[in-house]
C-alpha cells in the first residue's frame, strides 16, 4: 500500500512540476483528504499554495486540517482575507481550536479576526479548558433534541442542522436547561413504529458521559472500552457542552502510546515528528535521561571498585559480570513492560500489588532455576572442559549460578513494583521502564555476585 502511494505521489509531483494543473486537479479530487495532505510534505514552499488552490472548496478545508502546522502557517500567511474566511467556514470548531493552538500569535490574531463571531466564541471557550482535558478535546457541533419532540420533528431537525455537525449518528436529548437526559441514534429514529412517537419513549437513558475536566487519556480509554462513536461532555451540573468524537479519541490514543514509548526509551516526549525534528531537538529530548543514567551507573562502578581485591585473587569472576548484568536487566525489563502495559489498559490497580508480586515471584523462581541449571552446565562444559579454564572450579560455578538465580528473582520483583510505585506517587509508570530498571538491577546483581563470592570462596 505504501509503495503504491509513493508511486502515485511521484506521478502527481511530476504533473505539478510540468504545470499540468487540469490533470492534477482531476486526480486530486478523487483522493482522500488525508492522502492529499500527505503530498504537501514533499513539496517545496513555493509549490504548496499552488497545489492547495487546485483543490475544491470542501476538499481544501478537509485537507487543510490534516496538514502539518508548518504548511498550514505558510498557507495562512499567503491567503487573502476572503480565502482564509472560506477555509475557516468549512472547519469544525475543534479543528479550528487545534489550529489556533499550533500557530504563532500574529497568525492567531488573523485567524480570530476572520472567523465569524460564533466560531470565535466557541474557540475561546474550548481554549479556556485545561490542556489535555476533555473540554479542550471536544467539539460543540452536535445535534441536540428536546424531550417533547416527535420522531418526525427530530428527523427534520437532523436534515436541517446535520450538514454543519461533526456527527449525526448519535443525537443528544436535552431538557430546557440543557441537562443531558438521554441519547437517540439515527437507527432508533428510522425504526420507530410511528412518526408521532415522542423521543422520550425511545431514547436511551443513563448515558455514559465525561466532564470537561476529565483527562483526555481516560476519555480515549472509554472509547476503547465501550466502542463509542461519540461521547458527550458535560459540566459539573450535568449540562451538555459538547462531544468528543472517535477520530479525536484515536489521535489521543496514538499520541499517548507514542509518549509512553519515548518515556520507556528514556527520552523526553516530543510533539514533533521524527523527520521534522532537528538534531538539536533530538539532543534536547535525549541528553537529560542519558546524563541521569550515566551518573546513576556510578554506583555500579563503586561496587566493582570495592571488590577489587576479590577480583584480583580470582580474575575469572570478571568474565561472568556481563552475563549477570544483562540477564538481570532483561528479566527486569520483561516484568516492567508487562506491568506498565497492564496499568495503561486498566487491567491492574494499586490494590493488586501483592497479587502481582506473588505472581512475579513464582515466575522468577521458575525462570531462575531454569537459567541457573543451563548456566551451570554451560560453565562446566564450555568454560571448564572445552576451554580448559582451571580457575573455574565447581565452587566458582556454584557462585555464578546462585548469583544468577537470585538476580533473576530480584530483577522480576524490581521490574513489577517500580511501575506500581510510580503510579502511586502520581508519576507516569512508563518512567520506570527498561533503562532505569536496568541501572538498578545492574548494581544489585553485582552486589549479590560478590557477596556470594566472598561467602563461598572466602575471598
For each feature predicted by the language model, list its residue ranges.
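Non-transmembrane, extramembrane segments of multi-pass ion/lipid transporters
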Residues: 121, 248-282, 331-357
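Alpha-helical transmembrane segments in multi-pass membrane proteins
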Residues: 33, 289-297, 320, 324, ...
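Alpha-helical transmembrane segments and their lipid-water interface positions
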Residues: 108, 186, 246, 333-336, ...
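Juxtamembrane "helix exit" motif at the C-terminal ends of alpha-helical transmembrane segments
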Residues: 294-311, 374-388
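Membrane-interface segments at loop-to-transmembrane junctions
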Residues: 276-285, 349-364, 394, 398, ...
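Re-entrant/interfacial helical elements at transmembrane boundaries that shape
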Residues: 319-322, 333-344, 419-423, 434-435, ...
Amino acid at each position: 500500500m505504501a509503495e503504491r502511494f509513493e508511486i502515485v505521489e511521484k506521478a502527481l509531483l511530476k504533473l505539478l512540476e510540468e504545470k499540468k494543473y487540469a490533470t492534477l486537479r482531476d486526480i486530486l479530487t478523487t483522493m482522500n483528504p488525508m492522502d492529499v495532505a500527505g503530498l504537501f510534505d514533499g513539496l517545496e514552499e513555493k509549490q504548496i499554495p499552488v497545489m492547495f488552490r487546485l483543490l475544491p472548496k470542501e476538499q481544501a478545508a478537509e485537507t487543510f486540517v490534516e496538514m502539518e502546522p508548518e504548511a498550514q502557517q505558510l498557507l495562512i500567511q499567503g491567503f487573502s482575507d476572503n480565502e482564509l474566511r472560506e477555509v475557516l467556514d468549512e472547519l469544525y470548531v475543534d479543528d479550528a481550536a487545534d489550529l489556533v493552538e499550533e500557530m504563532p500569535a500574529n497568525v492567531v490574531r488573523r485567524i480570530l479576526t476572520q472567523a465569524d463571531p460564533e466560531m470565535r466564541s466557541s474557540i475561546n471557550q474550548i481554549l479556556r479548558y485545561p490542556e489535555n482535558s476533555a473540554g479542550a478535546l471536544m467539539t460543540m457541533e452536535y445535534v441536540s433534541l428536546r424531550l417533547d419532540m416527535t420522531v418526525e420533528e427530530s428527523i427534520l431537525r437532523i436534515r436541517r442542522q446535520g450538514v454543519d455537525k461533526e456527527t449525526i449518528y448519535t443525537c443528544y436529548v436535552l431538557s430546557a436547561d440543557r441537562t443531558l437526559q438521554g441519547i437517540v441514534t439515527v437507527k432508533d429514529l428510522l425504526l420507530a413504529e410511528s412518526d408521532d412517537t415522542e423521543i422520550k419513549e425511545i431514547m436511551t437513558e443513563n448515558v455514559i458521559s465525561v466532564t470537561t475536566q476529565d483527562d483526555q487519556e481516560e476519555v480515549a480509554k472509554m472509547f476503547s472500552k465501550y466502542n463509542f462513536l461519540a461521547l458527550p461532555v458535560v459540566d459539573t451540573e450535568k449540562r451538555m457542552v459538547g462531544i468528543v468524537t472517535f477520530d479525536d479519541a484515536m489521535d489521543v490514543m496514538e499520541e499517548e502510546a507514542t509518549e509512553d514509548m519515548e518515556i520507556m526509551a528514556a527520552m523526553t516526549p516530543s510533539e514533533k515528528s521524527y523527520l521534522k525534528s532537528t538534531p538539536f531537538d533530538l539532543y534536547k529530548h535525549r541528553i537529560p535521561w542519558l546524563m541521569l543514567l550515566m551518573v546513576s551507573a556510578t554506583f555500579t562502578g563503586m561496587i566493582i571498585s570495592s571488590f577489587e581485591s576479590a577480583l584480583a585473587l580470582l580474575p575469572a569472576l570478571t568474565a561472568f559480570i556481563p552475563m549477570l548484568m544483562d540477564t538481570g536487566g532483561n528479566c527486569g525489563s520483561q516484568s516492567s513492560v508487562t506491568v506498565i502495559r497492564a496499568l495503561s489498559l486498566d487491567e491492574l490497580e494499586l490494590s493488586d500489588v501483592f497479587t502481582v508480586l506473588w505472581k512475579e515471584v513464582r515466575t522468577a523462581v521458575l525462570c531462575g532455576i531454569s537459567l541457573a541449571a543451563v548456566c551451570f552446565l554451560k560453565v562446566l562444559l564450555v568454560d571448564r572442559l572445552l576451554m580448559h579454564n582451571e580457575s573455574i572450579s565447581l565452587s566458582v560455578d556454584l557462585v555464578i549460578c546462585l548469583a544468577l538465580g537470585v538476580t533473576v528473582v530480584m530483577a522480576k520483583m524490581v521490574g513489577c513494583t517500580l511501575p506500581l510505585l510510580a503510579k502511586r506517587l502520581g508519576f507516569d509508570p512508563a518512567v520506570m521502564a527498561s533503562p532505569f530498571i536496568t541501572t538498578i538491577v545492574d548494581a544489585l546483581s553485582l552486589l549479590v555476585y560478590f557477596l556470594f563470592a566472598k561467602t563461598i570462596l572466602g575471598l
